[in-house]
Amino acid sequence: MLKSYLALFLILVQESVCQAWSLPSYEQLDNWLARAGGNTGSGTRWNILPGPFYTPELGPGIGGAVAGQYRPSSDDTVSQNSTLSFSGYVSATGAAGINLSNYAFFAQDSCRFFLDGSVSDTPTYYYGQGFYAGERGSHKQKYTSQALTLRPVIYRQLTGHTYMGLGWVLDLQHAAKSDNSGPLLIENTPQGQSVFSSGVSLVLTLDDRDFVPNPRTGKLADIRLTRYTPETGSDTRFDEYTLHYSRYHSLSNKDVLAWELNGDFTRGNVPWNMLPLLGDNHRMRGYYEGRYRDRNVVSGQAELRHRLTWRHGIVGWLGAGTMAPSLHETGHRHWLPSVGIGYRFEFSPRMNVRLDYGVGRGSSGFYFQTGEAF
């Protein structure tokens, strides 16, 4: 662990310190990272990287990531490498959490298993639903979000790069330590402080990305329907429709242009914590996560990714998003911008840590995460 800290420190300060210092070469740093778990060779192994972070919600903190690439079968010559990553964090605000992400490919890429999950204890704010609720910065309620989320999906190949998926969504939310000195926004929702949502997902996907965690070429088109009902354990009955399209263009051996369009739409008795968000560490970076939420959200962004020397890289992006309480109003309401720049460090082949700075309307924030934003 100490070797990881030392290697990362030397990398970040190398070009800004006095030339009179005798700094280690890139080859020496590669060797140190290899011994710390960041080997750039062709063998399969785990990679460990700790580091600081800052987000608008969590404040400053420290986290760590463990990522690995593996092949479930050595006889499979078609599937791309499978990846499994864990990350954890603690912050100065008292927040703590663990995230899990797995992309597994089997049987000559005819079967896939994707899993995202998280457990967290995070002091945050609830602003209410809609654009104007998010704009009123003083009209909010502080609480501690105690949350557990699991999203497994099994995909079966239909033809070529087209897959049908069957999944499940579990979301457990409890609003602890809520501030009762101001507006009781959470207590006045129909569901109250504790919400349990459980639903079955049906997914149709066209996916020919060359490497799912960090594509250079290809596209992803995804249509997803999730139905939450009491029969599946959910407190309320509602539907969630998600549309996603992203494209990746390799402009040169050092440049990639990536862009995406997203739509999240809901109907039924949607709990306050399950309303689609406009702003997180993947989309609409620069906004406090959870400040803007409504029943229907649309967003898009374009990002230019440039590889510098050795393991370094930079990105820049532009994005915009909107939301509305009804489907026919979506696109005719207020639009919010997102713009930013970021630094990339390739601690394992095709797997990056990213430090992004996003600017939104009247807000901004830093993000230290593993993997690309999309």
What are the residue ranges of the model-derived segments?
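Gram-negative/organellar outer-membrane beta-barrel architecture
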Residues: G38-N47, Y54-G192, D294, N352, ...
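Outer-membrane beta-barrel "beta-signal"
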Residues: S201-L204, I341-F347, S363-F374
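Membrane-embedded beta-strand positions of outer-membrane beta-barrel proteins
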Residues: I48-P50, L84-G88, F113-G117, M164-L166, ...
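Solvent-exposed loop/turn segments connecting transmembrane beta-strands
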Residues: P52-G63, G88-I98, Q108, S194-V195, ...
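C-terminal outer-membrane beta-barrel translocator/porin domains of Gram-negative envelope proteins
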Residues: P190-Q193, V200-L308
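Short loop/turn motifs that connect adjacent beta-strands in outer-membrane beta-barrel proteins
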Residues: W21-L23, A34-T44, P72-N81, A107-R112, ...
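Extracellular loop and loop/strand-boundary signature of outer-membrane beta-barrel proteins
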Residues: S85-S87, E135-K140, L184-Q191, R227-G233, ...
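Transmembrane beta-barrel architecture of outer-membrane proteins
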Residues: G94-I98, V119-D121, T144-L150, L170-H174, ...
